[in-house]
Amino acid sequence: MLWYNPVKIKKEIFIILKNTDGNNVFAKIPFGVIQASNKINQYLLPTYLYLAVNKNIFGEVKTSVRSIREEYINTANRTYWHEDEFYEALIVLTSNIIDEENNSIIDNLIDIKNFEHLSQMELQYNSSKNLNTSSDFEAQIKNLVKEFDAETDYSLKKKDIIISINSFQTGKGFVKCSYQEYNLFRNFQSFLKKNNSRISICQAINAYYTVKFIIKRNEALINLGLAKKNCSDQVSKSLFKKECCFADNTAKCVLQILKSMNLIEVVNNPKKENDYYIRLNKNINESETQQ
């Protein structure tokens, strides 16, 4: 079962999709979205995933910023909690994001009806500055989108919006989200709410697909002869923390959640104390090397 939560339909309505293989490709997530979600705005990947999922089910997306927010924020009684971040995530997804060397990070992945002009924006951030925390990157993006707030008058948050998903260059790399994975995250959100977890479902989603992204990238480097074969199916502790911008305690908590969902395995490094490797659970994850 998968969920859909348009504004005018009561929340928690479930749609039964018959004859669906849980390991079929459900959504393709560009590498750039995963990296930008860790370094620019932690809601980029969850927002894109929400839009792609509903597009695949219904053929179109009619939603609102509040609808997206309600799927991922634990504090249900705070109506506008983190709404600005989801608004900014939509702005970023419509835009073309480049780094200081003009390398493309994201290329206009969505279009918003009546706001198509936003897709012409080119936002540049300097990755050589403020590398310590993701909030520093978010602050840069906040400054970049301020000038557009007056023009749009936050109307993206006030009413339903129709969003189209643009195709992206698969040559830049992507990972897959299956029905099975998506349902695991959707169901686990209820557990996090009941247990008042300090870890958000957004952090868990970002961390999991970052692990998939690193492993997929390793496979590509091995095929090019640029990496050792023994590193293809695992991610080191240091690389995981660096890519996710996590402190030690946060990394441990997130990994514990992903382990409890049976999405990953954590293996101690026999050569180094307090070190570990992260591997995907083979029972849930199919190899992507053939895709």
Model segments located where?
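Glycine-centered, phosphate/nucleic-acid-interacting loop/turn motifs that mediate DNA/RNA or nucleotide
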Residues: 97, 108, 262
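Short recognition helix of helix-turn-helix/winged-helix DNA-binding domains
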Residues: 1-74, 84, 88, 105, ...
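Short, Lys/Arg-rich nucleic-acid/phosphate-binding segment
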Residues: 104-123, 268-276
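Short helix-coil junctions and helix-kink-helix linkers
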Residues: 69-81, 237-248
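Short acidic DE-rich linear segments
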Residues: 286-291
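Phosphate-/nucleic-acid-contacting segments
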Residues: 234, 246-249, 253-256, 266-281
